[in-house]
UniProtKB/Swiss-Prot annotation:
Lineage: Bacteria, Pseudomonadati, Pseudomonadota, Gammaproteobacteria, Pseudomonadales
Enzyme Commission number: 2.3.3.13
Protein species of origin: Pseudomonas savastanoi pv. phaseolicola (strain 1448A / Race 6) (Pseudomonas syringae pv. phaseolicola (strain 1448A / Race 6))
Name of this chain's protein: 2-isopropylmalate synthase
Family: Belongs to the alpha-IPM synthase/homocitrate synthase family. LeuA type 2 subfamily.
UniProt catalytic activity: 3-methyl-2-oxobutanoate + acetyl-CoA + H2O = (2S)-2-isopropylmalate + CoA + H(+)
Length: 556
C-alpha cells in the first residue's frame, strides 16, 4: 500500500471553531501555570518496561526537587504495584506539605473505591476521573449514545462524593477529564462537564479541575486554543473551576497547543518531563517551562541542573533524550557552522553580567541550566575561524590576531577534511603547537643575548642550522628590529601582537608575528615563553621557518 494521491478520500480536516471574537491571539502568557507531572502514570504506562518501585520513588523525588507541586503518581486500581506505590509515598512520608499527590481512576465503583482506599491517610489528594466523550469512542469503543456517556460521568462523580466523605481527614480535590475532549463536540463536552460540576458543587475556595485533553492531537494548535477559549467562556461556575490542559504530540505541536491554550485562559498543565508518553508523547513540561523562562517569566520550576534531571529520566524510562531535544539535548547549545560560531564568539565577548541575554543563536544562557560553555562551539569541516578562535581563547587563553585566525582556520580545515571527524579543543591546540610552536627547521633558536644602550638594541642569537651552531648578530631600534637585521634572509615584519596568558607568577607571554620573507606571501608565527622578548623571538623564528618550508614545498 502507498500514500493516496487524494488523501481526502480517507482523511478529513478537523472542523474549525466558530469563534469570530476570539481574544487569545492578542494575549500573552505572563505567569507560570499550575504544573502537574504525569510521568509516573501516563508516562510510565507508555514504557516498554514500566518502572519498578525503586525507579518510581527516584523519579518522584526528582519531580519534588525541581518544584512540581502536583504529581500524578499512579493508577492505583490498575495493579497491586501501583496501589502499593501510593501507600509507600503516604506511609513513608515522601509527600511534602506543599505537594499534592494525584491518582487516576476509571468510572466504575469498584475501581473508585480501590482508588480512595489507596489514599487513606493522605493530607491532601487529587482524584482524577475520566471517561471518553468523542463520537468515535461513543460509537466504536463503548456503543453508547450521548446520554449514556453523560450518565457514566455523573454516576462516577456521585461516587467520588460518597467515598471522599468516608475519609474526611483528607483535603480532597476532584478532577474530571472528558477524554478525547479535542475530538468531542464542544456543546456536548460542556454539557457533561456542567453535569459533573453540579454533582461536585465546587466553590471559588475549593475548585474542581476540568482537564481538557488532546488525547490524540487531531488539529492545528489554534483550533485547540479556540476550544479552550470557548469552553472557558461557556462552562458554568467558571470562578470555581481550574481549566487544565493535557496535550499529546501526535502532530508535533504539543508545546504550541499548550502555549496557545494558556493564552486562551487555561490555568494548569499536565505533561511529562522531556515529552515521554503514549505514542509520540505528552507535552514536554521542561520545554514549556523554559520557554517561559526565556521570555523573562519565572516558571516556578528549577532546572538549574538539567543534565542531572535528564540522567534520572533516561535511566528510569530507559529511553534516551534526543540530541536535538530543546534545551537539554547534547547538541542544542552546539554550533559547528563557521558563521554561527563567529556570531556566538562575538556575542560572548560583548555579553556582560547583569545585562539582557543577547548572544546570537543561543536563546538561553547554558549556564542557567547547569550547562558549561565547552560544548557550545565544536569544530568540524563546516567550522570557521570563529569557533577555532573561541576554543583556543576559552581553553588555553590564546587570542589569535584576526589575520592569523584566517590562516590557522585553513590549517584546521585541512585536518578535519583529512580526518573526516570533529576536532576537540585539545586537538586544535596540538595542531597549533605542531604547525607554529614546533616550527624549528631550518633555523632553531637556542638562546639569545640582548644589550640595550641609548635607545638602541644589539642582539646575539645562538641558532642551530644544519647540525651546527651559528651566531647571528644585529642592531636596531628595538629587539625585533635588531634580530631582523642579523638574519641571513630579507624579512619584512607586517604585524605584531602580544598578550599575557594567565596571571601572577605562572603567567606567560604569547607573541604573534606576520612577516614576509624575500618578498614571498605573508605568513604567521607564534611564540610562547615566560619572557616577552623570548616569546617575540620565537614567534619570528616560527614565521621564518614556516615561510621557508612553504617556499621549499612550492618549489618541489
Amino acid at each position: 500500500m502507498t500514500m493516496l494521491k487524494d488523501p481526502s478520500k480517507k482523511y478529513r480536516a478537523f472542523p474549525t471553531i466558530d469563534l469570530p471574537d476570539r481574544t487569545w491571539p492578542s494575549k500573552t502568557i505572563d505567569a507560570a501555570p499550575i504544573w502537574c507531572s504525569s510521568d509516573l502514570r501516563d508516562g510510565n504506562q507508555s514504557l516498554i518496561e514500566p518502572m519498578d518501585a525503586a525507579k518510581k520513588l527516584r523519579f518522584w523525588k526528582t519531580l519534588v526537587s525541581v518544584g512540581v507541586k502536583e504529581i500524578e503518581a499512579s493508577f492505583p486500581s490498575a495493579s497491586q504495584t501501583d496501589f502499593d506505590f501510593v501507600r509507600t509515598l503516604i506511609e513513608d512520608g515522601h509527600i511534602p506539605d506543599d505537594t499534592t499527590i494525584q491518582v487516576l481512576t476509571q468510572a466504575r465503583e469498584d475501581l473508585i473505591a480501590r482508588t480512595f482506599e489507596s489514599l487513606r491517610g493522605a493530607k491532601k489528594a487529587i482524584v482524577h476521573l475520566y471517561n471518553a466523550t468523542s463520537p468515535s469512542f461513543r460509537r466504536i469503543v463503548f456503543n453508547q449514545d450521548k446520554a449514556g456517556v453523560k450518565e457514566i460521568a455523573v454516576n462516577a462523580a456521585k461516587l467520588f462524593v460518597k467515598y471522599a466523605a468516608q475519609q474526611p481527614e483528607t483535603q480532597w480535590t476532584f478532577e474530571y477529564s472528558p477524554e478525547t475532549f479535542s475530538a468531542t463536540e464542544l456543546e456536548f463536552a460542556k454539557e457533561v462537564c456542567d453535569a459533573v460540576i453540579e454533582v461536585w458543587n465546587p466553590t471559588p475556595e475549593n475548585k474542581v479541575i476540568l482537564n481538557l485533553p488532546a488525547t490524540v492531537e487531531v488539529a492545528t494548535p489554534n483550533i485547540y486554543a479556540d476550544q479552550i477559549e470557548w469552553f472557558g467562556r461557556n462552562i458554568t461556575r467558571r470562578d470555581s473551576v481550574l481549566i487544565s490542559l493535557h496535550t499529546h504530540n501526535d502532530r508535533g505541536t504539543g508545546v504550541a497547543a499548550t502555549e496557545l491554550g494558556l493564552m486562551a485562559g487555561a490555568d494548569r498543565v499536565e505533561g511529562c518531563l522531556f515529552g515521554n508518553g503514549e505514542r509520540t508523547g505528552n507535552v514536554d513540561l521542561v520545554t514549556v517551562a523554559l520557554n517561559l523562562y526565556t521570555q523573562g517569566i519565572d516558571p516556578e520550576l528549577d532546572f538549574s541542573d538539567i543534565d542531572g534531571v535528564r540522567k534520572v529520566v533516561e535511566e528510569c524510562n530507559q529511553i534516551p533524550v534526543h540530541p536535538r531535544h530543546p534545551y537539554v539535548g547534547d547538541l542544542v547549545h552546539t554550533a559547528f557552522s563557521g558563521s554561527h560560531q563567529d556570531a556566538i564568539r562575538k556575542g560572548f565577548t560583548q555579553q556582560k553580567d547583569g545585562e539582557l541575554w543577547e548572544v546570537p543563536y543561543l536563546p538561553i544562557d547554558p549556564a542557567d541550566i547547569g550547562r558549561s560553555y565547552e560544548a557550545v562551539i565544536r569544530v568540524n569541516s563546516q567550522s570557521g575561524k570563529g569557533g577555532i578562535t573561541y576554543l583556543l581563547e576559552q581553553e588555553y587563553g590564546i587570542s589569535l590576531p584576526r589575520r592569523m585566525q584566517i590562516e590557522f582556520s585553513q590549517v584546521v580545515q585541512g585536518e578535519t577534511d583529512r580526518l573526516g571527524l570533529e576536532m576537540s579543543a585539545q586537538q586544535i591546540h596540538s595542531l597549533l603547537r605542531r604547525e607554529y610552536l614546533q616550527a624549528n627547521t631550518p633555523y632553531a633558536l637556542i638562546s639569545h643575548k640582548l644589550q640595550e644602550e641609548n635607545g638602541n638594541s644589539a642582539v646575539d642569537a645562538e641558532v642551530h642550522v644544519d647540525g651546527e651552531t651559528q651566531h647571528w648578530r644585529g642592531k636596531g631600534k628595538g629587539a625585533l628590529e635588531a634580530l631582523v637585521a642579523g638574519l641571513p634572509v630579507a624579512v619584512e615584519i607586517m604585524d605584531y601582537n602580544e598578550h599575557a596568558i594567565g596571571s601572577g607568577t605562572t603567567a606567560k607571554a604569547a607573541a604573534y608575528i606576520e612577516l614576509r620573507v624575500n618578498g614571498e606571501r605573508a605568513v604567521h608565527g607564534v611564540g610562547i615563553d615566560e619572557n616577552i622578548t623570548t616569546a617575540s623571538f620565537r614567534a619570528l623564528f616560527s614565521a621564518l621557518n614556516r615561510s621557508l618550508s612553504q617556499t621549499q614545498a612550492k618549489a618541489a
